[in-house]
Amino acid sequence: MSPPGPLSIRRGRLDLHLHSNRSDGRHEPRFVLQTCAAAGVTLAALTDHDLPPALDGGAYTFGERSIIHLEAAEVSGAWAGRELHLLVYFPSKMPEDYRELLRGRARFRARRWDAFRAAAGLEARLPPAPEEALAGRLALTRHHLARALLDAEVVSRWQEAFDGPLNPASGLLLPLDLSFPEAIAGARAAGAVCSWAHPELDDARAWAGTFAGMGLQGLESGRPGIGRLMREELGRVAHKHRLFLTGGTDWHGWSGERPSFSFPMREGHAFVSALGLPTGP
């Protein structure tokens, strides 16, 4: 892998939603980026949950393939009793104060892990949050908790963990202490461009206008598994509220190879323009 070079975007395909093993993904950050490059993606963003990026932004070369990486994150925020996710992108280096904000969010996740162990009476069966998480360098998610519950034989099936102890209705998980509007405001104040990750259509119709008024700039409409009609409807919601569109695989690596889906540059021009990056001829 060659070291990062300057950003320059012309044409190609985008994957703006990816995860590594620094949050709930399976693979190392460099492997994720290399996999995207091998698939012909030309602009990618590792968006680990509530963490600063592991790789610098810029242009990378893997063999004969080149790819541009954006410094980014996926930030969780509470709204109307729900957990929503905000994709936060930077055109250059993520500011240090925002990196520290994200490390604080990762430390909250570590505290939530230990609080869950205590609330569920599982302190003898589940390990404490690792030092890396307590230091804000690893984001512990419900995926990690579900795996720990399976390994400890507290549950016998993956879905049982999410339907039972990890269901927010169980009251065993600490509620988020950051609201979605606060997540938007913090990202914008740091100079980021932000997009609402994987919104449900009804939620987008109900709340996109409200969030746009708070500073939201984009809506994730392109992702594997959604049909053309839903994608078009999300596009209409975005157009109504003057939001650009983003897209990505949300690939974690656990189900095998990265999906062949990628977001075409012709749909991502408004996003790239919002970042202030040159697109060339």
Give the positions of each predicted feature:
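Hydrophobic, aromatic-enriched interface-forming segments
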Residues: 123-176
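A metal-dependent hydrolase metal-coordination microenvironment
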Residues: 8-140, 214, 219-257, 264-265
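Conserved, well-ordered alpha-helix/loop/beta-strand core segments that scaffold catalytic motifs
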Residues: 173-200, 206-214
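Active-site gating loops and adjacent loop-to-helix segments of metal-dependent hydrolytic enzymes
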Residues: 78-110, 147-169, 262-281
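Acidic/glycine-enriched edge-of-secondary-structure segments
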Residues: 13, 17, 165-169, 186-195
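Catalytic beta/alpha-barrel core
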Residues: 46-49, 170-177, 195-200, 220-225
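N-terminal amphipathic alpha-helix/helix-capping segment at the start of soluble metabolic enzymes
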Residues: 1-11, 185
